[in-house]
Regions:
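Small-residue-enriched flexible segments
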Residues: 1-136, 140-153, 158-187
Length: 187
C-alpha cells in the first residue's frame, strides 16, 4: 500500500533528523500528527505519542524500515532509534495493534522453511522494547501465540532496543525497530 505522504530527510546526522523537506523535523512531525490524526503534539507529550507514530524509511524493494522517534532537541531536530540515511524517503506510520497473527504466522512460516519443525526446540527471540510499549499487554499475547504456533520446548530471549536481522536468507543485516526477531537456538 502506498504511503499517505512521502517526505525527504533533507538533513540528518546519524540517528538525528535535523530537517524534513528543508524544514525543522519536529515542526513537520507535529504538522503530520495534527493533520493526519488530530493530535496536538508538544515536547511535553512527545514520547507518549511518538511510540505509536514512528517514521518509516521507504526502501527500493518496497520494504519499510521503522524508526521510532525518541527525543526532540531545542533546535527542532528529532532523534530516532537507529540511523536515518541522508536524503532517505520517509513516511509517517501508525503502529498497528496486534496484527491478527500476521507477524507470528510469518515467523513460523520462515522458521519452518529454514529448519523444518520447531517442535521441542529452543527459540531465541529478541523483542523490541518500543513494540512492547506500544502493544502493552498485547505483547504477552503475541509471545504466547508465538510459543504455541512454533510448538517449541523453550522460548528464550531478551527485550531489546533495536534488532538486527534481514528480510531474506543471506540478506544484508539491518537495524530494525518495532521488530520481533527469532532464530532456532541449537541445544
Amino acid at each position: 500500500q502506498a504511503p499517505a505522504k512521502m517526505l525527504t530527510a533533507t538533513s540528518t546526522e546519524g540517528n538525528r533528523i535535523i530537517s524534513i523537506d528543508w524544514r525543522p523535523a519536529f515542526t513537520v512531525y507535529q504538522e503530520l500528527l495534527q493533520t493526519q490524526y488530530g493530535i496536538a503534539l508538544s515536547t511535553d507529550n512527545f514520547y507518549a505519542h511518538a511510540i505509536h507514530f514512528p517514521f518509516g524509511i521507504l526502501r527500493a524493494n518496497n520494504e519499510v524500515i521503522v524508526r521510532i522517534p525518541v527525543a526532540v532537541e531545542a533546535d527542532g531536530s528529532v532523534f530516532c532509534t537507529g540511523e536515518i540515511p541522508a536524503n532517505a524517503i520517509l513516511t509517517l506510520l501508525e503502529a498497528s495493534q496486534i496484527d491478527c497473527g500476521y507477524t507470528v504466522n510469518h515467523i513460523v512460516q520462515s522458521l519452518t522453511e529454514l529448519h523444518g519443525s520447531m517442535t521441542d526446540r529452543t527459540l531465541l527471540t529478541f523483542y523490541c522494547a518500543g513494540r512492547r510499549l506500544h502493544l502493552g499487554s498485547g505483547a504477552q499475547v503475541e509471545l504466547v501465540d508465538l510459543s504455541a504456533k512454533t510448538t517449541v520446548a523453550c522460548l528464550a530471549g531478551a527485550l531489546s532496543l533495536g534488532e538486527i536481522g534481514n528480510s531474506c536468507e543471506w540478506g544484508y543485516p539491518l537495524f530494525h525497530n518495532a521488530a520481533l526477531v527469532c532464530m532456532d537456538w541449537p541445544a
